[in-house]
Amino acid sequence: MYELAGELLTLSIMAFALGMDAFSVGLGMGMIQLRFRQIIYIGLVIGIFHMFMPLFGMLTGQLLSGWLGLLATYIGGALLLVLGLQMIIASIRKEDKPFIAPVGAGLVLFATSVSLDSFSVGLSLGIYGSHVWMTILLFGFFSMILTWLGLLLGKQVRSWVGSYSGALGGIILLAFGIKLLFPL
């Protein structure tokens, strides 16, 4: 009983930490003009990706070495750099619509970039032998809720900073991409 409670607490803390990545990206994405329905949908998609990426990581964690997790983190960082730069350039050019919108393939790109780190964690948890269902449900739940909070807060910040919101959102994504590529 205590062992299960300890694992639940540990996985919840881990899920919250990974969800903060989704919050940060949501904050940047929220500065793009989004409808409430899109915000709900984006949160759901990112939550689902945060369930499947660690699941895939857990399943392959027993087969592959740790280098794949590091590679996934670098790919995620590079994607966020590109997305952030694109948002900044679009803002400078005064383009109304971002080049990569958070719908369709653009949303898959956003969700993939923010959930690649959960794949890396899944690799480690797969080797450790963590409870699969508890892990993926907690990861999905926390990332979905924190994405919604980030998107809603980003939408509010957008109304405060006006035309600079796209550049600010791009800077947030760019900074987060740099953080993934060059951890302290």
From Swiss-Prot:
Gene (name only): mntP
Protein name, as recorded: Putative manganese efflux pump MntP
Membrane-related topology note: Multi-pass membrane protein
HAMAP family documented for this protein: MntP_pump
Localization terms from the record: Cell membrane
Role, per record: Probably functions as a manganese efflux pump.
Keywords associated with the record: Cell membrane, Ion transport, Manganese, Membrane, Transmembrane, Transmembrane helix, Transport
Superkingdom field: Bacteria
Source organism: Bacillus pumilus (strain SAFR-032)
GO-annotated cellular components: plasma membrane
Major subcellular location class: membrane
GO molecular function: manganese ion transmembrane transporter activity
Transmembrane segments: 12-32, 39-59, 63-83, 99-119, 132-152, 164-184
Pfam families referenced in this protein's UniProt entry, alphabetically: Mntp
UniProt record similarity statement: Belongs to the MntP (TC 9.B.29) family.
